[in-house]
Amino acid sequence: MLTWLAEFAVYFTPLNLFRYITFRTGGAIATALFFVFFFGPNIIKSLRIKQGKGQPIRSDGPQSHLLTKKGTPTMGGLMILSGLFVSTLLWANLSNHYVWVVLWVMLGYGAIGFYDDYLKVTKQTHNGFSGRGRLACEAGVALVACIAMMKLGTPHMTSLAFPAVNGYVVDLGLFFLIFGPFVIVASGNAVNLTDGLDGLAIVPVMIAAGTFGIIAYLVGNAIYSDYLRINFVPGAGELAVVSGAVIGAGLGFLWFNAPPAQIFMGDTGSLALGGLLGTIAVAIKHEMVLAIVGGLFALETLSVIVQVVSFKLTGKRVFKMAPIHHHFEQLGWSEPQVVVRFWIIAFVLALVGLSTLKLR
C-alpha cells in the first residue's frame, strides 16, 4: 500500500525508498513485530478467558507436559496471521498477484486450522476436523492458488527445476495442478506436525521464510537470476516483503511462545504458515529446494509416516513416540535441548538450500 508514496519522490526524494524491496522488507519486519508485541497480551488474555481449559494435552506424551502445558490457550496463530496480514498490506505492492495468492492460502489454511482448533478446544479432544474433510479443504484452497499462478504467472510456472543441476527443467504441464497443490498441502501439514514444543516450529518457519525471501528477491531480479542461472520470475521479488512480515510476526510470537509458553500457535498458525511457505516455493519455482530448507519439517512428517506404517505392518513402533521430537524427549532430552538442537538443524539446512543457488 505504501508503495504509492514513491510516486511523490519528485517532490520529496526520500520517498523513493518505497520503491525498494529491501527497504519495504525491513518495514514489514518491524511492523509485524510491533503489531504482535502490542496486541499480543490482549489477544492472549481474551483467548485464555474464552477457552478455559486451553488446548488438550496428549496423555501418552511426556508427563512433564501435563504439568507445564495444561491450561495454556491455543489459536495463537491469530496473533501471527493478523500481524503478517496488516504488515503485508502496508508494505507490499498490492498490484502484485503473487502477494494475493500467498495471502489467499495463508487465510484459507488459517481458517481451516482455526476450525480444527475450535473443535478440539470446545470438545476437549484431539479429534478436531476430520482428516479427509480437512485435506479436501486444504487441497481445494491450494488448487485455486495454483490455477491462479498458472493463469497469471510466466510460461515457466508449470516447470520444475532441480537444485544443483544447471539447465535441466521439466515442464509439468497440467500435472502442475496436482504437483503444486501437493507441495502446498504437504508443507502446511509438515509444519503442523512440527509444532509440538514451545518455540519448536516458529523459529524454523522464520529461518525458512528468510531463506525464501532471499531466493524470491534473486528470482525476481533479471540480473541476479541470469547470473545464477535460475528461472526469472517477474514480480516474485515482492514475496520477499511477505517473507519479512513472517519473520517479524514470528519474532513477536516467540516472545510469548518461549518456554514456558503463554500461548500455542495451534493449527491456526502452523497450518497457515506451512501453506504460505509452500506457496512461496511454488511461486518462485524452488519447490525442490523447499525439501532441503524445510528438511526439519520433512523429517517430522517422515517419522510419523514410518511409525504408522511400521505399526500397521509389524505391530512394532520404530520410535518411542512420533513425531520425532517426542522420541528424543522420551530418550531423556529436555524440551529446551530438543528445541534448540532442532533450530540448529533448521539453520544448517537453510544454508545448504541457499548453497544450491550457486551449485549450477
UniProtKB/Swiss-Prot annotation:
Keywords of this entry: Cell cycle, Cell division, Cell inner membrane, Cell membrane, Cell shape, Cell wall biogenesis/degradation, Magnesium, Membrane, Metal-binding, Peptidoglycan synthesis, Transferase, Transmembrane, Transmembrane helix
GO biological process, one term: regulation of cell shape
Principal place of residence: membrane
Family to which this protein belongs: Belongs to the glycosyltransferase 4 family. MraY subfamily.
Membrane topology note: Multi-pass membrane protein
The protein, known as: Phospho-N-acetylmuramoyl-pentapeptide-transferase
Places the protein is found: Cell inner membrane
Keyword Transmembrane helix: yes
Matches recorded under InterPro entries: Glycosyl_transferase_4, PNAcMuramoyl-5peptid_Trfase, PNAcMuramoyl-5peptid_Trfase_CS
MF GO annotations: metal ion binding; phospho-N-acetylmuramoyl-pentapeptide-transferase activity; UDP-N-acetylmuramoyl-L-alanyl-D-glutamyl-meso-2,6-diaminopimelyl-D-alanyl-D-alanine:undecaprenyl-phosphate transferase activity
Required cofactor(s): Mg(2+)
Primary gene name: mraY
Organism: Beijerinckia indica subsp. indica (strain ATCC 9039 / DSM 1715 / NCIMB 8712)
